[in-house]
């Protein structure tokens, strides 16, 4: 699985429902009254009435954890990726996710924002909050796309 932006958010919701047993887990974008809002508005936007121009937009740094798919793909501990979103992983759920095996392999340098989530034990299970497609080119694929295709080919070969 490789989820980009909303794809990472959906992976986080699926983990909450399937692994944590939070049947009503959701994003406040889709279910504002969810008892388990694992995806929510960025904290600095919670009290805003007018959302115009409030996205997290542009390039931001991301710190990568060692021994992760992210580190395997990038080969370095600090990267910069482009964003376009206003919803993010709700840190109130971070500890319970980690207790149940989720790995937050990419974070803002200060550790407050989840940038990437992995689930070990799969050939490839990675969700990223940013948009790697913005930095990928036909003659120079983004490192995560390369790793995803490589993992898919390895699974295909193993199952042939």
Tell me what each language-model feature is.
Residues 1-16:
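Catalytic nucleophile loop
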Residues 18-160:
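Amide-donor transfer/coupling interface in amidating biosynthetic enzymes
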């Amino acid at each position: 699985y490789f989820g980009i932006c909303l794809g990472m958010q959906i992976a986080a919701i699926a983990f909450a429902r399937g692994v944590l047993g939070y049947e009503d887990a959701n994003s406040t974008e889709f279910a504002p009254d969810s008892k388990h809002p694992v995806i929510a508005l960025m904290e600095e936007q919670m009290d805003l009435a007018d959302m115009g121009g409030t996205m997290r937009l542009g390039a931001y740094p991301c710190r990568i954890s060692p021994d992760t798919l992210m580190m395997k793909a990038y080969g370095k501990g600090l990267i910069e990726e482009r964003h376009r979103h206003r919803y993010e992983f709700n840190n109130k759920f971070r500890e319970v996710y980690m207790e149940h095996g989720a790995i937050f392999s990419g974070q803002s340098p200060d550790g407050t924002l989840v940038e990437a989530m992995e689930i070990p034990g799969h050939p490839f299970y990675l969700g990223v909050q940013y948009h790697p497609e913005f930095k990928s080119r036909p003659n120079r694929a983004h490192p995560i796309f390369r790793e995803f295709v490589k993992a898919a080919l390895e699974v295909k070969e193993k199952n042939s």
